[in-house]
Amino acid sequence: MSAPEVENKPADAPEHCPGTESENAGKASACAGCPNQQICATGPKGPDPSIALVKEKLKEVRNKILVLSGKGGVGKSTVTALLSRAMAQLNPERNYGVLDVDICGPSQPRVLGVLGEQVHQSGSGWSPVYVEDNLSLMSIGFLLGSPDDAIIWRGPKKNGMIRQFLTEVDWGQLDYLVLDTPPGTSDEHLSATTFLKETDGNWGAVLVTTPQEVALLDVRKEITFCKKMGIPVVGVVENMSVFVCPKCTTESDIFPAKTGGAEKMCEEMEVAYLGKLPLDPRLAKCCDEGKDFITEHSKSPTVIALHQIVAKVQDFFD
């Protein structure tokens, strides 16, 4: 039998944390090396104070979307950028934000075309970088001296960075905050989930996969993670589903779905299937160059499919 979940523990706590309200807080063997050990051992017992700070900071954010993937390389960051750009363009009267919590591999500054921009600080906190008038971005990529700098951090330091993003970035009023996460179910996911589940407004997860079974195996685990953590699943996007020839429009399966693909998996796991995004080589080029694929190639089958997916995502929240 697995150990029960401890609810009252900091987001950056070790795996077997006894909880801040326990008599063993700061004294148990699991507490060794935890950045909160001294506070827990000497301070009053109670919930993580950061949770209240995050709730206050995000009180004007109506909807939060976690973009997840079980495996790397399925296009999760690309889908995050496409989803955010499309919603911002379709709803110019609304405000959108992207938070890149892939601490070790921040790619949103390049994908969204704002690589090299600087984050400014004011009395109300860090100001996110604006991609469009109604689309802003915050990423650790803006805080590095060079895009080639490596982030070599253990879990507690990553979690501290995410806490700082959620408590110190001045997002203002947002209709949607989209979080780009690393692959799998790691410290970043646990930290973001612990904070977001206590905030006001709606939240949910969009999962990204490719058709082949090796990717579907991991996205099944991601769905199980969402159910265990109480994260509403908005649905699954099947990325790179087919290749549509730009000359003759013939469809080819680059990654054959041997077991029925994402749609069949969604039926088995009882989650929504949002749709499939065809593979378009021009999209990869736009991501590398930080260009807006949606406006540059508006007639692409990928853009047409994207708008259908966006409609389903917005229906879930609205």
Curated annotation (Swiss-Prot):
Record's subcellular location: Cytoplasm
Any single GO CC term annotated in Swiss-Prot or TrEMBL for this entry: cytosol
Molecular function via GO: 4 iron, 4 sulfur cluster binding; ATP binding; ATP-dependent FeS chaperone activity; iron-sulfur cluster binding; metal ion binding
Principal subcellular localisation of the protein: cytoplasm
Annotated CDD domains: Mrp_NBP35
Bias (Basic and acidic residues): 1-15
Keyword presence, Cell inner membrane: no
Cofactor note: Binds 4 [4Fe-4S] clusters per heterotetramer. Contains two stable clusters in the N-termini of Nubp1 and two labile, bridging clusters between subunits of the Nubp1-Nubp2 heterotetramer.
Any Gene Ontology biological process: iron-sulfur cluster assembly
Residues that, per the record, bind [4Fe-4S] cluster 1: 17, 31, 34, 40
Region described as Disordered: 1-29
Keywords, ordered alphabetically: 4Fe-4S, ATP-binding, Cytoplasm, Iron, Iron-sulfur, Metal-binding, Nucleotide-binding
Classification via PROSITE patterns: MRP
InterPro entries: Mrp-like_CS (IPR000808), Mrp/NBP35_ATP-bd (IPR019591), NUBP1/Nbp35 (IPR028601), P-loop_NTPase (IPR027417), YlxH/NBP35 (IPR033756)
Residues binding [4Fe-4S] cluster 2: 245, 248
Cofactor list: [4Fe-4S] cluster
PANTHER family reported for this sequence: CYTOSOLIC FE-S CLUSTER ASSEMBLY FACTOR NUBP1, NUCLEOTIDE-BINDING PROTEIN NBP35 YEAST -RELATED
Subunit structure of this chain's protein: Heterotetramer of 2 Nubp1 and 2 Nubp2 chains.
HAMAP family xrefs: Mrp_NBP35, NUBP1
Family: Belongs to the Mrp/NBP35 ATP-binding proteins family. NUBP1/NBP35 subfamily.
Role summary: Component of the cytosolic iron-sulfur (Fe/S) protein assembly (CIA) machinery. Required for maturation of extramitochondrial Fe-S proteins. The Nubp1-Nubp2 heterotetramer forms a Fe-S scaffold complex, mediating the de novo assembly of an Fe-S cluster and its transfer to target apoproteins.
Name this polypeptide is given: Cytosolic Fe-S cluster assembly factor Nubp1 homolog
Species per Swiss-Prot/TrEMBL record: Aedes aegypti (Yellowfever mosquito)
